Amino acid sequence: MSDAPVTLSQVAREAGVSLATASRAINGSATRSVREDLRERVLETARRLDYSPDPSAQAMARGRTSALGLVVHDIADPYFSTIAAGVARAAERAGLIVTLASTEHSPERELAFVELARRQRSRAIILAGGRLAPDDGGAGAGGAGAGSAGGAGGSGATGGSEGADPEMSALDIETGSTADRPGSGAPTSDALEAALKAFRDAGGGVALIGQPVDDLPVVKVANADGAADLARALHGLGYRRFAVLAGPTRHRTAADRTDGFTGALSELGSAPPPEDVLTCAFTRDGGYSAMTTLIERSGTGTPSGNPGHLPELVFAVNDVMAVGAMAAVRDAGLSVPDDVAVAGFDDIHTLRDVSPGLTTVRIPLAEVGALATDLALGRSNQAGAQVRGEVVLRESTPERNR
């Protein structure tokens, strides 16, 4: 028996179809399709003969390369790296290679990468980032009455509504992580949306992780529902006085989580006062700063301080901020959970060894990445998907005796 590899001609002959039909069935085609029964016959024959398609031929036939582009703000952020791992595994199963762009919060680089992927005829592109919420004066993150944390030392909280956070990008589709820093002349959200639609209209696949943009496929995280579930669980443990580290003003993810948490507490009669909903950066340092503001304002740890002015529990809208808040408590000579309890959101796997263990809402981020990949490649019949979180109670929020 010959050791020569099986050729496409052999597959076509064995399946009883023309070489062109066999090529279209196996490699795909940008212009012509194959009847489903013929395609199945060819694919079954290829499997039986152990035929290995030529990736270059597939790319030429489809008019697409085997690259899948993934755009994130910061690959060093564990939120994005976990999503990227899920994308990479799903892409590997599809025989694709992931091309990663870490934009460092630059909307110019974000737009440039989408246009580069279109020029290079990548198979698909996935955007994972954050998105601006409408500036409607609502009570979400940065809504009316929200406080504002100062610098690393915590310059205090001020009431009142703020404008758009200067660090936010023109279009960042759901982060769970850091804010953007647009430069002068940053592209608008319309420009990025137009680039994504042009990529799709040229035959590429597109998926977003976060909030929907027009009719583009999206994997949404049920942020408000998860935060509401957490609020109810913490209230059930006996907590009544809460504060929220709400993230950047007008950041969609932060707003959804803040609104879900405070809304559930309002229904339970334990809504935090507006001055205890603090806007801050969506980072470890942002959490540290906002927590320091709460501690300094309460006077806890000082001769004239009143420990009763410190909230019983502080909810940070992501885990990284929660870790910063816990560090601020420690640096102030206080203890989590003895002096104040802390909870986060996301259940970042690299933070699960934090002591005390952090109560949070677990989001299956790798699954989110895999779902987005399936949407981008057209492997799902759905126009989108939604992922719901699970409350995980740990040592940072023990049951409170009242």
What spans do the regions from the language model cover?
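Periplasmic-binding protein-like
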Residues: 122-130, 205, 243-245, 277, ...
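Short, well-structured alpha-helical segments in soluble
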Residues: 110-121, 288-308
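Alpha-helical recognition/docking segments in bacterial nutrient-uptake
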Residues: 2-3, 55, 67-232, 236
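N-terminal helix-turn-helix DNA-binding module of bacterial transcription factors
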Residues: 1-63, 145
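Flexible loop/turn connectors
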Residues: 295-402
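Short beta-strand segments enriched in small/hydrophobic residues
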Residues: 14, 19-24, 61-74, 233, ...
